[in-house]
Amino acid sequence: MLSLTLQTTASDTILFIGGGAVAERRLALCLQEPCQCIVISPVITEQMKSWYEDDRFVWHNTIFTDEYIDMVKRCKLLFICTDNTAVNDYVEAISRKYGVWLNRADDATSCDFTVPSTIDIGDLHIAISANNGGPRINRLVKRDMMNRYSELQIAIPRLKIMREEVKLLIPSVEERSQFWRTYLGESEFQAILKGQWPLIEEKLHHAISGIRTKS
């Protein structure tokens, strides 16, 4: 499996065929990105209705027909989320004809891409996929990682500032790498996870001050 990060723009369209629970989960992720989301479905979930009433996506309250083929051709990504196999087969055939990347909820083998479960812990963004092992595994791993890495929410913003300081003080890429290997190794990382970030932060500040004094 090749994992990629898609960068969308305001001019990109992401199209959803279907309006059930799967479409809702996929749409929830896309609504956080700078793109236009369009849903074609005669029925949508209550949560999707709430988003629609807030003008967060475009809803075509109808079944998929040939009228929407041009929309498929123009979209950046296509999510096929209906419970009708014949409709899903037809929409997939159209997307294949025009080279549109698709994700099909009822057939993982037909997917050009998958949507991993994601975790945001401050500046840390983690994608999780059990490779079709089931959503339960994803949820358990997600919960474990949220607990395990919660301390990084405090540490990462400060480390970003320190990284810029070290860049200014140490021009050499190799020497900078050596600095971080020396002062932010596995033992320091484990200490951060155990809630000892203030101690590690103090040590890093001391090391940076030492470099500043020498220069």
Question: What are the language-model segments listed below?
Answer:
Residues S41, H60-I63, D106:
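Short loop/edge segments at beta-strand edges and connector loops
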Residues L102-I154:
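E1/E1-like adenylate-forming module used to activate ubiquitin-like modifiers
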Residues M1-W51:
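Hydrophobic, well-ordered beta-alpha structural blocks that scaffold small-molecule cofactor pockets
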Residues G20-V22, T85-A86, N132:
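Residue-level detector of alpha-helix initiation sites
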Residues N132-S215:
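An accessory alpha-helical subdomain
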